[in-house]
Amino acid sequence: FNGGLFTFDPCHIDEKQAFTPDYRKWGGGTMTAQNQRLVYWPMLKSGDFDMMPSQFNFYNRMLKNAELRSHVYWQHEGACFCEQIENFGLPNPAEYGFKRPAWFDKGLEYNAWLEYEWDTILEFCQMILETKNYAGADITPYLPLIESSLTFFDEHYRLLASRRGRKALDGDGHLILFPGSACETYKMTNNASSTIAALRTVLETYIKVCNNEKWQKMLETIPPVPLRYIEVKDSLNLQASTMTPAWKQTISPAKSWERINNIETPQLYPVFPWRIYGVGKENLEIARDTYFYDPDALKFRSHTGWKQDNIWAACLGLTEEAKSLSLAKLSDGPHRFPAFWGPGYDWTPDHN
């Protein structure tokens, strides 16, 4: 997404950027999980399992520092991996914030996009588990990584709830995932659907590998994916043969949120990567209605860069939508080599 190995003089992309070919828009040594994950998910189905451990080991090497973040900043267990992270396990300093207020939580990135976004590690945990399902891989070296990543969410959100009141769980015995973040888009969320779907799917998959009572109990504390009704104007009323407003049940980005800060569509993450909804699964219509009627999903729809609308369309059985978006995504780029896309939201070439 950020140029890969094949960068060239940035003035050919943006004449204002008078730097060397080593320039990358979001920094040269920073791992941005939201972008990187889309390079690795397809490797499961293409059988390129030998290419995946380099990414898994990247996180495994950083595990101790990620755990130290939790110990030092909040005095609890679990690994806290940030979205934009250096190869030693700490946040990119520019995103962490050079001009931070002294009173601000030292564990948080002082950044409107990245604050509270800690769940992208769970996609790589799921990939690790899937390599066992697809290829019978020995994932023993990564089990501490998976367990520590899950533990963080359990301990951190119990801690935050206990600071606000007497009880660590809600009235239904569920974690209160607040404050959270649904991708970089919906901020200060309460129970983001993307985080809930991630925790539920990783826990369900991990329990099949390690049937431990601890993880079963944690699974019981994960709240349901939040739903909401959206008014759809000019819907066909078959009984009256007229066009009247209707209400469609859809996946909500979260139970609540304070602002929108980017253009991702986390309300469809329960479709992909988490596969809770899809063809052959329950409540397919809820997910399809989210795709077709959610106003932000429609506003944010695109084939550019890390956009994954074509994947969602395919998972929902929307063949023509998937075809149209995929053809647009894979059309020739603007450079001599036709598969050099970008800059899109990032840099050129954009591989994701």
What does each of the following model-derived ranges do?
Residues 1, 15-16, 51, 64-69, ...:
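Secretory-pathway/luminal and periplasmic proteins that interact with or process carbohydrate-rich
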Residues 1-18, 53, 216, 235:
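Gly/Pro-rich turn-and-neighbor structural signature
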Residues 1-12, 59, 71-78:
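Short, solvent-exposed turn/loop segments enriched in Gly/Ser/Thr/Pro and often Arg
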Residues 1-13, 129, 151, 158-159, ...:
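An acidic- and aromatic-residue-enriched active-site/binding cleft used to recognize and process polar
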Residues 2-9, 141, 159-174, 214:
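Short, glycine/acidic-rich hinge or "gate" loops at secondary-structure transitions
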Residues 8-27, 85-114, 177-192, 254, ...:
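Acidic/His metal-coordination segments adjacent to aromatic residues that form catalytic metal sites
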Residues 32-67, 76-85, 90, 108, ...:
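Active-site core of glycosidic bond-cleaving carbohydrate-active enzymes
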Residues 148, 152-209:
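Acidic/histidine-rich catalytic neighborhood
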